[in-house]
């Protein structure tokens, strides 16, 4: 059963060939025997999962089942789950058990899905390799046969590794600068970052509030569409959540692609892209031409400024968001503080990891009195230029296509001493978050036995078009079906 997609598992449950309790137990057993190799989970919630599975079987017996009823999945450990620890990969929240559910969590519960647990992640979603987690690094299921341990990408590396290793059929992720798409690409799965405001952020622990967006991670575009059907929608608890009708994202998956206009941003096919990666991406684009699409080169002239702008805006917002973790109300508190200031200082110094502290420092500096205009305000002006570049491009084409990552998965520890080198891993994904548009990663080949992702970028609220393009590609290729050895 572990090799079946969400859609296939739903049909198995519908037919009565297996119950949700049996299916859930199979996945829990596999998780406990296999995850030692990957460290993709922080918390496995056996009792709650089996209770949800029993409720799902009752729901089905009463004729109230949805597509998701009884289907196992996992949440990235950034979504609050009532009664289940939500750590955000940090010592700071190692003992935090939320008293409420995030909206995304509540939506899956209402659909009858079964949450097996919480997946590992970079601490507070800050990272591109899933090596900054308080619970240890996650290992990419690909490349293990050669004796190498590769990173799965970050920050949603646990979700990506768990789906790639067939430990769960699907998992939620979040994307602030590439944190769904980059791990999806490096682990050979499908991942979608929706339009900013399409998915509620209520109960999703904040990193950078104007950039964060939750989204689906699964093996197929069809499964991603099924997930987005549950995740998307207006939520009055999140003031940035858009009040706009949610289509059935599975309804247009089979539309033909004849006449689709594809733009290739010349800035994303630059010297930063490894030649072998470019070859795989261009091969994938040729498949689209066979499906009836046309291709032209376009320009995003301000793309080169994206990383500089992002690493002012995101840390600035993070420094404000993370100021709430002070040892007073919840989270880690240092032992025997001398006074209030000592408690604040030591709780944060001991509770946060190095990468989080680095970004808080950068963000606080960018927001400080003498530098606000020079850094933060200027970065926001650059952000507007980047957004306008995409608006202009979509006047000419329907979608943009590019690589997701400049290289395949690198070895664990390879970039830990060079933060800038690590930040450059997101060079092709960050601008999309700054603009707030949707984009997804689709498996598109291999380099040296490691997966390559094709990035499909769309205009605002064009998730259905992206999923359609990805699904049609997956009908004529089998990259998404390959399994790590």
UniProtKB/Swiss-Prot annotation:
Catalysed reaction equations from the record: L-glutamyl-tRNA(Gln) + L-glutamine + ATP + H2O = L-glutaminyl-tRNA(Gln) + L-glutamate + ADP + phosphate + H(+)
InterPro entries hit by this protein: Amidase, Amidase_CS, Amidase_dom, AS_sf, GatA
EC number(s) from the headed UniProt entry: 6.3.5.7
Active-site residues (renumbered): 76, 155, 179
Enzyme class: ligase
GO annotation terms (biological process): translation
Cellular component GO terms held in the UniProt record: glutamyl-tRNA(Gln) amidotransferase complex
Keywords tagged on the record: ATP-binding, Ligase, Nucleotide-binding, Protein biosynthesis
SUPFAM superfamilies: Amidase signature (AS) enzymes
GO molecular function (one): ATP binding
PANTHER family: GLUTAMYL-TRNA(GLN) AMIDOTRANSFERASE SUBUNIT A, TRANSAMIDASE
Family membership noted in the UniProt record: Belongs to the amidase family. GatA subfamily.
Subunit relationships: Heterotrimer of A, B and C subunits.
Function description: Allows the formation of correctly charged Gln-tRNA(Gln) through the transamidation of misacylated Glu-tRNA(Gln) in organisms which lack glutaminyl-tRNA synthetase. The reaction takes place in the presence of glutamine and ATP through an activated gamma-phospho-Glu-tRNA(Gln).
Name of this chain's protein: Glutamyl-tRNA(Gln) amidotransferase subunit A
Organism: Marinobacter nauticus (strain ATCC 700491 / DSM 11845 / VT8) (Marinobacter aquaeolei)
Name of encoding gene: gatA
